[in-house]
Amino acid sequence: MALPSDPDHDARETLRLIGPDPQNWVPDREGIDHNVFVVGGGQTGATFAFALRRAGIGKVTVIDAAPDEGKAGIWLTHARMNRLRTPKGLPGPELGLPGLSFQSWYEARHGAEAYAGFDRIARTDWANYLKWYRDFLGIGIRYGTRLLRIEPADGYLRLHLDAGGTPLIETARKIILANGFGGSGGPMIPAVPAALPQGFVAHSSAAIDFASLKGKAVAVVGSAASAFDAAGTALEAGAQSVRLFARRTSIASVPINRVRGYPGAYDNYPRLPDPVRWRQALRFREAGSTPPPDAVERVVRHKNFHLHLGAPWTNADIDGGKVVTDIGAETFAFDFVIAGTGYFADPTRKPEFSNFAASIRLWRDQYAPAEGELDEFFGAHPYLGLGHEFLEKALGEAPFLRNIHVFNPGGFVSFGLPIGDVPSIRRDVPAVVARISRDLFLADLDSHESRITGSHPAEFGEEAYASAVWRPAQTIAAE
């Protein structure tokens, strides 16, 4: 089948059919720079910009700490998988508009047969689609701008920013934290490798120079997808050997979250009772985060790859310029160690929240697990409202927290998904936008009540129906 001469035709037709964007209905407030301030210009930040526009909410800005588009997000930086880990057909940034979907974009450029030929999207194709999405929809991102601190003020939030070394202070009524895995916490490295000197160890999220690992002995600690991706990248870069060390006695292979992927569970999960959500989080943790099959195949095809099961690191030293560790009865030496060990979530440890961190309600403040179900890791996650907003630890202590919406993996326990990943977009982006719309509308209710009870010019006069007005016979006779 011939490819269309205009690959953007369906996307343009989609926008034509849904009609023009609504005008901004949010009244201006003196001293307020932004109605909504989105932190993070990746796939969810761009999606929020479009969703808010379609909701008629103006004065929205999106920032990203990366210096430019090419270094923003994970897909062209520290994401190292060959293909996305989720099925290709999951709804994403298109927000129910087929002409803006990845499938439509891809088929317009490569054909329907090419799309049918794979089950998961190539990482670089996804990055190219997101670039097109931003460009086609005219979504501007302020690159090189970092959020340093949020300061509550009287009826708004004061944002302390760093724009390429220039300090800025801007104001906003609402904030969306669409800033990825580190947005509510940071990289998690086990204590033993974390104690190694700089230059010998890096978290998988770091900008690792894999070319420099050619001919080197590399250790990877961890057994989730990011660990296998790092191992595969090191092997393909020419590492002499790569050994992956897993605490588990077998690699997690059951994607436990998929059993609740049906609409009833997916749509209603945020409203489940706390004990159910807590037990589901524990179930996920016990089952383990699964690498996709191709990530495992990518490494095991190399003869210089070795997998160590039931092998946590309990010691490590530097000897002769090498990292030396004893695992069981064996001693191993490495030139470099990569920790593919995930992230922690704990907003009390984030400098951006230093003005009010103690007031944020966490799961450990909200829910007391039964004996045998305690988990410090999940207890440190924020306990979020249905609009992904922070909640106060004590009622009335910090009411401004409801204006900070968390759209990053810190919402995992509350919403049952790694928030910010593709599976979270269809359900949770509209929920956040609806809550922001409601809050902004009700906060300006006096203005809106005046507007909705105001006068409107008539669309026609009495002459439009005068000829059809029934006139009883006695009325005519009396004339």
Where are these regions (language model features)?
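Flavin (primarily FAD) cofactor-binding/catalytic cores of flavoenzymes
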Residues: M1-A66, Y115-A237, R243-E479
